[in-house]
């Protein structure tokens, strides 16, 4: 007779209850909703909140909690804004690396150059996704601000 073994469900104080199984594959964090593009398909035109950057201490606190409770295999930085625009982005990546948390980044690629590549290698970002939303240079120009 085969017995199905269910993965252990961990309880987290006051937030998740017993229904969420950890670790998650990834947790997405929006460091900023500021972006250097003005894409026609982006819902930011409908956004009513102010453009801002997440507070460094808050981000570090979230990373600490994810590391302490082993909540996810990886944190991915993206959502509405361009993560490279956060003024303390590399400090945030360093903080995650020091806590043993793998990081992924989704970017529009405009900040990627040789210098950024060297910095990314030092902070051991485990994944960099470049979001290419256009098939050619002409359509790219229409979405870039």
Question: Where in this protein do the model-derived segments appear?
Answer:
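Conserved phosphate-donor/acceptor-positioning beta-strand/loop module used by diverse small-molecule
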Residues: 130-132
């Amino acid at each position: 007779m085969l017995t199905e073994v269910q993965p252990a469900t961990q309880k987290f104080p006051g937030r998740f209850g017993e229904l969420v199984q950890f670790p998650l594959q990834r947790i997405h964090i929006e460091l900023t909703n500021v972006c250097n593009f003005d894409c026609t398909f982006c819902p930011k035109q409908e956004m009513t909140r102010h453009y801002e950057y997440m507070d460094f201490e808050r981000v570090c606190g979230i990373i600490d909690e994810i590391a302490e409770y082993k909540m996810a295999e990886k944190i991915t930085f993206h959502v509405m804004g361009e993560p490279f625009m956060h003024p303390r982005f590399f400090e945030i990546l360093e903080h995650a690396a020091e806590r043993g948390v793998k990081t992924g980044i989704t970017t529009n690629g405009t900040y990627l150059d040789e210098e950024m590549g060297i910095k990314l290698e030092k902070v051991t970002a485990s994944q960099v996704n470049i979001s290419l939303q256009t098939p050619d240079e002409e359509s790219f120009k229409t979405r870039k601000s």
